[in-house]
Amino acid sequence: MHINVGSVHEREQIEQLAELTGEAERYGLPVLAMTYARGPDIDPEADDYNQAVGHAVRLGEELGADVVKTGYTGDAESFQHVVESTSLPVVIAGGSKGTDEETLSMVRGAMDAGASGVSMGRSIFQHDEPEKIARAVASVVHDDAEAEAALREAGLAVEA
């Protein structure tokens, strides 16, 4: 279930997430809410974009989620605000397609900001070598590896 704070569908998405978390609680099921700041008045390039993302993850908590997934805001300093906006574990989405080093640098920045991990799909399963990139991501998340070292250890090329 996801909410796009700032979208034209925000109200319905909030209602749906609230309903889902209520039902999930009845059955003892955890909920991962995908919480994003997206919409006509949301500018990902704005200096205060991390405030909007922080609001989105906090809203996920207030609506009963157990874990929130969101997009990385571009650097560890701005993402730290996002992580500090909630008491829930925060995991990042894979984001737009980039180089392996860009992906792992994003993961490194999120972890440095206090994120709990990642929830990646296409960044892994559409990769030419999904096992290797998954190993590299795991190395950053679980072994505190730097991006370049994780690439080398996984047997992936490091861009020059």
Regions inferred by a protein language model and the residue ranges of each:
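Histidine/acidic-residue-rich catalytic or RNA/ligand-binding cores of hydrolases
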Residues: 103-104, 128-137
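Alpha/beta enzyme core
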Residues: 1-90, 98-116, 120, 139, ...
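C-terminal extensions of enzymes
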Residues: 157-160
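Glycine-rich beta-alpha junction loops
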Residues: 96-97, 124
